[in-house]
């Protein structure tokens, strides 16, 4: 009778645990990188919307010699009945995408402000272009004095209401 001693091959529990830990670390790194990419994509989409809307406002100004007035409500901004926003890129737990117009130092100016899904705030100014907005983001029309320090009166419009959602002109 012959007895064969065969050594069993396979992975030990320690080796399997090491592999599982390494996979977990790689997954965590991937998730963090993916979130960063998503945030940058949202920021870029919001900035693009601000530039495009500012272009529409400038076009209105070139034709009419003044900036369009805001409706002071959820209605569309004068002369811009529809404007499709990249809605998935915006924070929706607050009023968002503000257009403000008023007189500053005797000169008519406008500002557009928005908060990205990443939480970054951006503003486009008629005299300074696109910038990161560092002011406080408030509720309702209180954003306009921060975006555009005007003397009353000013008019405004906004695209998203925290309670009722996106206004029809933004779709």
Where are these regions (language model features)?
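N-terminal leader/signal peptides at the extreme start of proteins
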Residues: 1-11
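Alpha-helical hydrophobic helix detector
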Residues: 14-33
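Short, solvent-exposed linear motifs at loop/edge-of-secondary-structure regions
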Residues: 27, 33-36, 41, 110-116
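Conserved hydrophobic/amphipathic alpha-helical signal-anchor segments
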Residues: 34, 39-90
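Mobile, glycine-rich extracellular loop/lid and propeptide segments
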Residues: 58-62, 96-102, 111-113, 119-125
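Solvent-exposed loop and beta-edge segments used for protein-protein assembly and interaction
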Residues: 104-106
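Short, surface-exposed interaction loops/tails
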Residues: 108-171
